[in-house]
Regions:
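Catalytic-core "active-site belt" of small-molecule-metabolizing enzymes
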Residues: 2-201, 236-242, 250-258
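A conserved acidic, glycine/proline-rich C-terminal tail/linker
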Residues: 205-234
Length: 258
C-alpha cells in the first residue's frame, strides 16, 4: 500500500466522520486512474465501521452518463452486509447525509461466482445467479454537487453506497422473458413511471462488473448481492415519502421515509 492510498482514504474517512459534504479530490489527492481509485476505495471500506461486504453496486451505468463524464465504463462500490434490508423497510432520513433512491434489479450470486477463469457474457451469466429480486438502492451522495462530478473521486468514495432494500425473489426467474417485465415506480400519489426492466442493461452490466471484480482480485462469494444500475433517474427522498418498485406481477419492494 502506498502512502498516497493511505493518505487519501484517511482524508475521505475523516470527511465521513465529521459529516463533511462530498467534494472532488484535487491536486496530489486525486488518483491517477481507476486502478488507484479502487485501491483507495478498498482501504476506505476497511476504515469505515460498517462491517463486512455483502455485495457490490454500479454507478454511472448508462452511456449518456459515461459520455457526459468522459469515461468508458461504470463506477462500482461495495455494499455492506448489514445495510442490505428486506421489504417493507422504514428508512430514517437523519441517518444519511443526503439520501436518494434508485430502482434496480438485484442479483444473488451462486456458488460458481468464485471461478475467476470464466469470462462472463450474456450467454453464460445465468450460471452465476441464484436469485433475481426487485430492489431499491439507497444512495448517500453526501450533499454532492453533480455538476462537474469527478468519476475517480466517486470511485474513491465507494460510489456513494448507502444500502439496499430487497423484495422477494422472482419465482422461476430463469423461465421468465425479461423483455416482458415492466419496472414501475410508485412515489406517493404521483403519476406512475413505467419502463422495461432491461432498459438499464442489468445482465450486461452484471457481466462487466463480475469480470472487473475478478480482474482486480476483489472478494466475490456465493450469497453476495449485486445491483447494476437504475431504470429511472436518481431522485432525492424526503420525510413522508412512500416509494414502491414493482416488477409487473413478479414482485415489489417498498420503503417509507421518516
Amino acid at each position: 500500500m502506498t502512502s498516497k492510498i493511505e493518505k487519501v482514504s484517511e482524508f475521505i474517512f475523516q470527511s465521513h466522520k465529521s459529516g463533511d459534504a462530498f467534494s472532488n479530490l484535487e491536486k496530489d489527492m486525486k488518483p491517477q486512474d481507476f486502478d488507484e481509485a479502487y485501491e483507495i476505495q478498498k482501504r476506505l471500506r476497511q476504515k469505515l465501521p460498517r462491517g463486512p461486504l455483502g455485495g457490490y453496486k454500479i454507478a454511472l451505468s448508462s452511456k449518456i452518463q459515461q459520455d457526459y463524464h468522459k469515461i468508458t465504463q461504470p463506477v462500482y462500490g461495495g455494499l455492506f452486509k448489514k445495510e442490505i434490508f428486506h421489504s417493507p423497510k422504514t428508512i430514517v432520513l437523519k441517518d444519511y447525509h443526503r439520501m436518494s433512491v434508485e430502482f434496480e434489479l438485484a442479483f444473488e450470486l451462486s456458488d460458481r461466482i468464485t471461478d475467476s477463469t470464466i469470462n462472463r457474457n450474456p450467454k453464460n451469466i445465468f450460471s452465476d445467479i441464484s436469485n433475481v429480486m426487485p430492489a431499491i438502492e439507497l444512495v448517500d451522495d453526501r450533499g454532492a454537487n453533480y455538476e462537474g462530478l469527478d468519476p475517480l473521486s466517486l470511485a474513491c468514495d465507494n460510489a456513494w453506497s448507502g444500502g439496499l432494500v430487497l423484495g422477494d425473489p422472482i419465482c422461476d426467474w430463469k423461465e421468465k422473458d425479461f423483455l416482458n417485465i415492466q419496472s414501475t415506480c410508485e412515489w406517493n400519489q404521483e403519476p406512475k413511471l413505467t419502463t422495461n426492466v432491461l432498459d438499464a442493461k442489468p445482465f450486461e452490466n452484471l457481466c462487466w462488473l463480475i469480470n472487473e471484480l475478478h480482474s482486480c482480485q476483489n472478494e466475490l462469494k456465493a450469497g453476495m448481492i449485486i445491483i447494476t444500475g437504475s431504470v429511472f433517474k436518481v431522485r432525492q427522498a424526503k420525510t413522508g415519502d412512500k416509494i414502491n418498485h414493482i416488477l409487473s406481477d413478479h414482485g415489489n419492494v417498498s420503503i417509507e421515509v421518516i
